[in-house]
């Protein structure tokens, strides 16, 4: 009886760990303000199977939870670059970058300085 209980416990534990499909990662995304935050988070959530996206304005850290069986980090970063924000891996095109609101032009040193005050 003890052996059967042990085998069942082992089986349940194995199945539980096998079902964990969500990856939790943090990446750096460039931006300067709350409008950037909204745009970055929406772009990440629009990526297939992203469950959570929270970007910190001060640290530029984007915390993600996503189903790694259905998408990958590169695809999520591409969605973010498509709306005009750079990541370490994928830089936004000039066209995408220039489409953001003027106060969100994070590559501009004057804009960066304005947001530090």
Residue ranges of predicted features:
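Bacterial Sec-dependent N-terminal signal peptides
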Residues: 1-23
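Short amphipathic alpha-helices in soluble, non-transmembrane regions
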Residues: 39-43, 75-83
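Short, low-order "capping/linker" segments at domain edges
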Residues: 97-117
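Surface-exposed aromatic
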Residues: 57-65, 95-101
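N-terminal targeting signals for Sec/Tat export/insertion, comprising classic cleavable signal peptides
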Residues: 26-54, 58-61
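Conserved short beta-strand edge segments in small beta-sheet-based binding/regulatory domains
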Residues: 84-96
């Amino acid at each position: 009886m003890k052996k059967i209980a042990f085998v069942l416990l082992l089986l349940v534990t194995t199945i539980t760990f096998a079902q964990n499909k969500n990856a939790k990662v943090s990446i750096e995304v460039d931006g300067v303000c709350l409008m950037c935050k909204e745009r970055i988070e929406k772009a990440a959530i629009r990526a297939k199977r992203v469950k959570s996206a929270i970007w910190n304005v001060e640290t530029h850290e984007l915390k993600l939870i996503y189903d790694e069986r259905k998408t990958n980090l590169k695809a999520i970063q591409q969605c973010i670059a498509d709306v005009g924000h750079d990541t370490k891996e994928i830089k936004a095109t000039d066209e995408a970058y220039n489409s953001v609101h003027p106060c969100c032009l994070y590559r501009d040193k004057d804009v960066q300085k304005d947001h530090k005050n």
